[in-house]
Curated annotation (Swiss-Prot):
The keyword Membrane applies. Belongs to the AIM36 family. The gene is AIM36. It is a single-pass membrane protein. This is Altered inheritance of mitochondria protein 36, mitochondrial. Keywords: Membrane, Mitochondrion, Transit peptide, Transmembrane, Transmembrane helix. GO terms for cellular component: mitochondrial membrane. Its main location: mitochondrion. It comes from Vanderwaltozyma polyspora (strain ATCC 22028 / DSM 70294 / BCRC 21397 / CBS 2163 / NBRC 10782 / NRRL Y-8283 / UCD 57-17). It is found in: Mitochondrion membrane.
Length: 243
């Protein structure tokens, strides 16, 4: 057994939910500020440039690490003072892993911020072979599962923002993480998938492509300004389908 102490700089004991939410809020605030600085909606200046993929990916790595440490600190029973060496190594290797769940072209994935699944299905002509995934519904399933390690975090978000709005306040990376976890267990090579009500921002979209799969396109309403940063970015790689 390996005791996590001052030498490793990691404490495996539980932290209070208040501290967890504070960490999450700071992280979301930082991501929000980055989005506003990087993508100023409606700006006509010719000097506006889309940040490089590497910079956005770096934000994703840092955000994922902070979110992971916050979520893993939840323990409603007694603090855990020891972890095995294997557990520690698994955590660290997981943070360094940059291999996506699906290889390029292994699955066909479309993203869409449109929330109404009926409208989304209509866009794809009610294709019976298409799999439709809503990360908000996945989050709700997790919230109602007392055995899921992320249930306490989601319950705290509901207390603060309500059941109708807490999805919009998920910590950075959680929507993509829940989607990836579901797809890993339920999807296979050759599947055609629409992840709707997603992404919430450009960072989530980049995280999705880094850790889950390269997407085919993103389907949005024409002139939709709600996720302008996402649209601007994917227009540069010709992956936007406007309707």
């Amino acid at each position: 057994m390996l005791k996590i102490g001052r030498n490793l700089g990691i404490r495996a004991g539980s932290i209070s939910r208040t501290r967890l939410l504070t960490m999450s809020n700071k992280l979301m605030l930082g991501s929000s500020c980055l989005s506003r600085r990087a993508y100023s909606a409606g700006s006509s200046s010719s000097n506006n440039e889309i940040p490089g993929f590497g910079k956005i990916a770096l934000v994703g790595v840092i955000g994922t690490y902070i979110f992971y440490k916050a979520a893993q600190s939840i323990d409603r029973n007694k603090p855990k003072e020891y972890v095995s060496e294997d557990e520690y190594n698994n955590v660290m290797s997981g943070l360094k892993r940059r291999v996506s769940i699906f290889k390029p072209d292994e699955v066909e994935i479309h993203l869409s911020p449109i929330k109404d699944v009926t409208k989304v299905k209509r866009l794809f002509r009610d294709d019976k072979q298409m799999i439709y995934i809503d990360p908000a519904k996945l989050a709700e399933q997790v919230r109602q599962d007392p055995e899921d390690p992320y249930e306490p975090l989601l319950e705290e978000l509901v207390k603060k923002h309500g059941t109708e709005a807490y999805y919009d306040h998920l910590p950075f990376g959680m929507a993509a993480m829940l989607t990836g976890r579901y797809m890993k267990e339920n999807c296979k090579a050759g599947d055609r998938i629409v992840v709707y009500n997603f992404p919430l921002n450009i960072q989530e979209a980049i995280k999705f492509e880094n850790e889950i799969s390269i997407l085919k396109d993103i389907v949005v309403y024409k002139d939709d300004q709600s996720i302008d940063g996402v649209v601007s970015y994917y227009k540069t790689v010709k992956k936007v389908q406007e309707i």
